[in-house]
Amino acid sequence: MPSTALGEFVGTLVLILLGNGVVAGVLLEKSKANGAGWMVITAGWGFAVLCGVLVAVALGAPGELNPAVMLANVIAGTRTVPDALVHVVAQMAGAIAGATLVWLHYFSHWRETRDQGAILACFSNAPAIRGTVPNLISEIIATMVLVLVGTAIGTTGVAGGRRSSFEALL
């Protein structure tokens, strides 16, 4: 279990470093990617997820990188609660480490950027239109799709019958 937790830590670090890094690059003043737009952010996050999973799996971890995915596996009976807790702690620590690296990397840009909303968006998201119920529904749908697709990729008989998400991605 310790090596798989390390893989989840490093994979999540890579995920957040690249994902939040592309957001910071697009939103912060005087960065080379400033103003590149929403498509660059979404493509960058897609690449970040791929890289995070590849790194985690290469280190022997399942590449789940998200407490919601871990919870789904506990509910499905493929993970024990103690195992899940260790991995969730590793994921959270990896996310904090990745965000810290983004903060350090863009250190001089934080002072140059006057838009507090842009600074906040580098580390969090907010709805375009606030509404508790619609926003909750949006998060539920997004999490369900994440878990559904991630589970489908790693299922026997999908993607050429391969058994792991790492092999399916190849």
Sequence positions of predicted segments:
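Membrane-interface helix-loop junctions and terminal tails of multi-pass membrane proteins
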Residues: M1-L170
